Every structure is written in structure tokens, then in C-alpha cells.
């Protein structure tokens, strides 16, 4: 007779071994966190897929395309007059500069010389548009870090400049004032004086950002040595604009490959750089560049006051066709380098118009910036890249 099996032995054999720990001995797994596509800290529908180990970011991947509207394909179904209306919409904070790049590419294909009066007016409007763009980020970036006051100052300054832009073009954001061969029409009587007053008024209040934002120890603590982008990463990802210059990359198309009237403004044009490459350096570059753009606007007004009366555009045929061929035009947009690759088959619509938008390249640097940082610093780093989602997705 065999002895009865002990029931406790069967229970023990079925038990699994579990390690229990607390604090540093606790077993942990990485967590995947989705930021967006609808999130208060993003400028539009950007999604970030972040892998976290505790409070540290291990991996970050920007997921783009939620605002893609097929702008490049739409260009192929519009003639050279109509694409100006589409070109200023993907980066709604830099509308004039986007129009400018397209018409410069078409003018280069046509071998067209633009009247001097149009060249200087374009330069003035481009710098005013740059100030409008930068003021938006000078106000919104502190807001993302918890400082609500600067954004009210920024919108007050923007309103003064938007008033003169609206007076000359009829639009507050989408100007549609550029034309192939020049501008839509000459500026109204007395407009230059009103621009000079608006520029002086904005300049007189720019010390608010120096004192209220840069003088705030909490802001400096949240941004100094946070999100450091190396010069090597700038070159690797094709980063441009104030973000690249904050990392010590001394490159600005207005100086290095002048277009419009920038070749004659070398004494006034100042390329602002920093070497730290952190969030604070990027904000400082943006602020100082805004002040320089106000100086450039004054220099343009001084030069325009001594121009002889003349045409503001070229007479064009009823049906405008670019000759067969291809060309590339690029401009120093407020957010960085924008490129326009135009291919023509000799028809009234472009065969292909490829956009190289600054925000698309700049946002790729997040895969380099975010790993190793704290989740709490993610918003500070993201906001310091000064991007527009429409400019990424096109």
C-alpha cells in the first residue's frame, strides 16, 4: 500500500517564483507615451511618440502628416498667378516670405528683372513679416513655461505691424501681395511714414522681453543647459535659421547669398549667433534677430525715400508660361531656409514645385534633443524649436 500523496506538495509545485522589491530594487518596464496630436504644448497637430524609463526620455519620434494638404500636388493644377495664393498658407506666420520664394523661382526661370522699387519694398515687407513671426514665438514660448504676461505684450506689438501690412496688402495673415515681376501695386500715400511710426513704437517696448522674460530667474532656470543641440547635429539634420545659429552655426542666406536688397544692407544686417545651443540661446537669438529686423526695416524706409518714381511690377502676358527647364530658389525665411525647386515643361502650370520647408528639417532634431532629458523639460525643448505644423506637413 503506497502512502497518500501530500496535497501541499502539489500546490507548491504549481507556484511561480516572484521577486518583490521596492525603490531601486523594483523591476520596471519602459512606458510609451503619446504627446498629441492634440496637446496644449504643440503648435498644431504634431504627435510625439516618447519611450520613458521613469521620468527620463529614452527615445522620441515625431509623427507628422496630420495636417498634410498636398500643397505640392495642388501647385501642379494652378497657374503661376494662382500658386501664390497657395504658397503663403503652409506657414501662416511667414506668408509674405513664402510667396516671395515662389515668385523668385518663376522670375529666375523667365530671366526677369524686377524694378528697383519692388525690390526694396519686398525687402521691407519681408523684414516686417519676420518681426511678426518672431513676436508670436517671443510671446508664446514663455506662455508654454507658465508665464502668461509676455503673450499680451507680443500681440499688442503684432497688432501695430499687422495694421500697416493690412493697409498695403488687404490681408492680415495671407497677404497675396507678391506678383511675378514685382508687387500687386504701389504702396498707399503716407504709408511709409506710418510704417516708420509702427517700427519705432514696437522697438520702444522690446525691452519688456529683456527684463520680463530673460531677467526672470525661473525662465532662465527652465531653459539654461536644457535641450542642447550640437553644431554637428545641426549639420546632420539640416537645421537652419535661429535654431542653427544658436548652436554656433554662422549661416544666413541674407548675408552669405544675398537676394533682394540684402547685398546693399550689409552694414545694417547682423547675423545673431550663440554657442550654447540650449533653449535659452535659441530664445536670445530670436529676440536679438527681431531687433535687427526692425533696424533693417528702417534702413529700407530710408532707401525708399530716395528712390525715383517708377514702376512696381512688370507687364505680363495674359497667359504666363515659364520656359522649359528647372531652377532652385531659396530664401532665409523667419524660421530658417526655405527652398523652391521648380520644374517646367513650358506650360502655364508647373510640372513640379518642390518645397524645402525649414520646420520639416528642424523638427527632426527632436530625436537628438529629447533622449536623456526629463519629461518636465519636454515642453521647454519642443517650444524652443519655433516651428509651424503646416510648414512641416505642407
Curated annotation (Swiss-Prot):
Main EC class the enzyme belongs to: translocase
GO molecular function, one term: NADH:ubiquinone reductase (non-electrogenic) activity
Membrane topology type: Peripheral membrane protein
Keywords (A to Z) from UniProt: Cell membrane, Membrane, NAD, Quinone, Translocase, Transport
A single cellular component GO annotation: plasma membrane
Reaction catalyzed: a quinone + NADH + 5 H(+)(in) = a quinol + NAD(+) + 4 H(+)(out)
Tree of life domain: Bacteria
Main location: membrane
Any Pfam family matching the protein: Complex1_49kDa
EC number(s) per entry: 7.1.1.-
Localization (cell): Cell membrane
Protein family: Belongs to the complex I 49 kDa subunit family.
Subunit structure: NDH-1 is composed of 14 different subunits. Subunits NuoB, C, D, E, F, and G constitute the peripheral sector of the complex.
Known role: NDH-1 shuttles electrons from NADH, via FMN and iron-sulfur (Fe-S) centers, to quinones in the respiratory chain. The immediate electron acceptor for the enzyme in this species is believed to be a menaquinone. Couples the redox reaction to proton translocation (for every two electrons transferred, four hydrogen ions are translocated across the cytoplasmic membrane), and thus conserves the redox energy in a proton gradient.
Protein name, as recorded: NADH-quinone oxidoreductase subunit D 2
Amino acid at each position: 500500500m503506497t502512502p497518500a500523496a501530500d496535497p501541499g506538495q502539489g500546490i507548491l509545485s504549481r507556484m511561480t517564483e516572484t521577486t518583490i522589491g521596492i525603490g531601486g530594487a523594483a523591476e520596471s518596464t519602459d512606458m510609451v507615451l503619446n504627446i498629441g496630436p492634440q496637446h496644449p504644448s504643440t503648435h498644431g497637430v504634431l504627435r510625439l511618440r516618447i519611450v520613458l524609463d521613469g521620468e527620463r526620455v529614452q527615445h522620441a519620434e515625431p509623427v507628422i502628416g496630420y495636417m498634410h494638404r498636398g500643397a505640392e500636388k495642388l501647385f501642379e493644377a494652378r497657374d503661376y498667378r494662382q500658386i501664390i495664393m497657395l504658397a503663403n498658407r503652409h506657414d501662416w506666420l511667414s506668408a509674405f516670405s513664402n510667396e516671395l520664394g515662389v515668385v523668385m523661382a518663376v522670375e529666375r526661370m523667365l530671366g526677369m528683372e524686377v524694378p528697383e522699387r519692388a525690390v526694396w519694398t519686398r525687402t521691407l515687407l519681408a523684414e516686417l513679416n519676420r518681426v511678426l513671426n518672431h513676436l508670436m514665438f517671443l510671446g508664446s514660448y514663455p506662455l508654454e513655461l507658465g508665464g502668461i504676461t509676455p503673450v499680451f505684450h507680443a500681440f499688442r506689438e503684432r497688432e501695430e505691424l499687422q495694421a500697416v501690412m493690412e493697409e498695403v496688402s488687404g490681408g492680415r495673415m495671407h497677404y497675396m501681395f507678391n506678383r511675378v515681376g514685382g508687387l500687386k501695386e504701389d504702396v498707399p500715400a503716407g504709408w511709409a511714414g506710418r510704417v516708420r511710426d509702427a517700427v519705432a513704437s514696437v522697438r520702444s517696448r522690446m525691452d519688456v522681453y529683456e527684463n520680463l522674460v530673460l531677467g526672470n530667474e525661473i525662465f532662465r532656470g527652465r531653459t539654461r543647459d536644457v535641450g542642447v543641440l550640437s553644431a554637428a547635429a545641426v549639420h546632420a539634420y539640416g537645421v537652419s535659421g535661429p535654431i542653427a545659429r544658436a548652436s554656433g552655426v554662422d549661416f544666413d542666406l541674407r548675408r552669405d547669398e544675398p537676394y533682394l536688397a540684402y547685398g546693399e544692407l550689409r552694414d545694417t544686417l547682423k547675423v545673431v549667433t550663440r554657442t550654447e545651443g540650449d533653449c535659452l540661446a535659441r530664445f536670445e537669438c530670436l529676440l536679438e534677430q527681431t531687433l535687427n529686423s526692425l533696424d533693417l526695416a528702417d534702413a529700407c524706409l530710408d532707401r525708399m525715400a530716395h528712390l525715383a518714381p517708377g514702376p512696381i511690377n512688370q507687364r505680363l502676358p495674359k497667359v504666363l508660361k515659364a520656359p522649359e527647364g528647372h531652377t532652385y530658389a531659396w530664401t532665409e525665411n523667419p524660421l530658417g531656409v526655405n527652398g523652391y525647386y521648380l520644374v517646367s515643361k513650358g506650360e502655364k502650370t508647373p510640372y513640379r514645385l518642390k518645397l524645402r520647408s525649414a520646420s520639416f528639417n528642424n523638427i527632426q532634431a527632436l530625436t537628438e534633443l529629447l533622449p536623456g532629458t526629463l519629461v518636465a523639460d519636454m515642453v521647454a525643448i519642443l517650444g524652443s524649436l519655433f516651428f509651424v505644423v503646416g510648414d512641416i506637413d505642407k
